[in-house]
């Protein structure tokens, strides 16, 4: 998910958009609000015994208590409402492989809960067995509903942990009679790992099922662009890029970038120029702190 479903539908003062840049023909109304929750609930209803793993920006940014602008209310973790079994947060290439290996012989909660950068619901007895020195108990969802400072305290802890290069703390937040457990994030991918992800043979095109249904505006804007790094150290209060991708810059190699440029140049409809060579926000290619040990 590139954009949260509610944000794709919403404009100023909670009015519905008349168009949607992510659908063929730019037409609005083809995606439900809170799509991850809606689709997860459908899957669990149709296939109750099949584990559902959610990820992407909509799930990632709702892994704990969060403010929902559309309803003007605090919402619990998306795990509590969606019924999903596991949540992968942040950029998940490394994690999704670990999850796939752990589930090779079926759903194994014990193995999955040992993986970094995931979230899941548990009972209090599981939390009691966690190492107290490596566990941070957040204020509960119910406390956040009645006390604004509780929600603020939680955010401070979450933001502090997301700013660490190598976080070690497991976060726990009570929701009703259960707990949301968030394992610490992985370090950023190495350049080699990031290159491998970008070097996969992507089609760089909309799904064939959309053929003949009109141009997809968002696709037309980025079809001849190249992403050269991840992360943003800006930390702007209005933006969630650093919360999802992290504040440490993760750059591709020049070889990988140039290989993609050659592929784009040879693609159908190329107009003779690259529309953008950049990253999520600004060009921070290979930027970083002088003393990484302090991070």
Predicted segments, located by residue:
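Single conserved hydrophobic/aromatic residue that forms the stacking wall/gate
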Residues: 1-8, 12
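Well-ordered, non-membrane alpha-helical segments in soluble/globular domains
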Residues: 29-40, 69-72
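Surface-exposed amphipathic alpha-helices with a cationic face
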Residues: 39-47, 265
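Short beta-strand/loop segments at the ligand-binding rim of alpha/beta enzyme cores
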Residues: 47-57, 61
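Structural recognition of alpha->loop->beta junctions
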Residues: 72-91
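Two-component system phosphotransfer/interaction surface
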Residues: 91-105, 191-198, 262
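Non-catalytic, alpha-helical, charged scaffold/linker segments
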Residues: 109-172
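Radical SAM [4Fe-4S] cluster-binding motif and immediate context
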Residues: 147, 153-196, 200-295
């Amino acid at each position: 998910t590139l954009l949260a479903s509610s944000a794709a539908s919403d404009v100023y003062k909670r009015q519905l958009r008349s168009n949607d840049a992510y659908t063929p023909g730019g037409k609005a109304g083809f995606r439900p609000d809170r799509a991850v929750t809606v689709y997860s609930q459908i899957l669990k209803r149709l296939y109750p015994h099949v584990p559902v793993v959610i990820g992407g920006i909509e799930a990632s940014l709702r892994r704990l208590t969060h403010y929902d602008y559309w309803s003007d209310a605090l919402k619990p973790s998306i795990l509590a409402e969606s019924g999903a079994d596991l949540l992968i947060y942040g950029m998940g290439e490394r994690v999704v492989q670990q999850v796939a290996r752990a589930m090779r012989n079926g759903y194994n909660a014990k193995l999955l809960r040992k993986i970094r950068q995931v979230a899941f619901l548990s009972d209090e007895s599981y939390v009691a067995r966690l190492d107290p020195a490596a566990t941070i108990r957040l204020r509960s969802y119910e406390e956040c509903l009645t006390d604004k400072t509780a929600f603020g305290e939680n955010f401070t802890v979450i933001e502090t942990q997301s700013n660490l290069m190598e976080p070690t703390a497991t976060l726990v937040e009570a929701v009703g009679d259960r707990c949301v457990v968030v394992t610490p994030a992985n370090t950023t991918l190495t350049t080699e790992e990031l290159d491998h992800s970008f070097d996969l043979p992507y089609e760089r095109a909309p799904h064939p099922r959309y053929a003949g249904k009109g141009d997809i505006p968002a696709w037309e804007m980025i079809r001849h662009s190249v992403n050269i790094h991840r992360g943003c150290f800006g930390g702007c209060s209005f933006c969630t890029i650093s919360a999802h991708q992290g504040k440490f810059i993760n750059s591709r190699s020049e070889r990988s970038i140039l290989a993609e440029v050659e592929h784009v140049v040879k693609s159908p409809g190329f107009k003779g120029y690259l529309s953008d060579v950049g990253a999520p926000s600004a060009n921070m290619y290979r930027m970083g702190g002088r003393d990484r040990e302090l991070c």
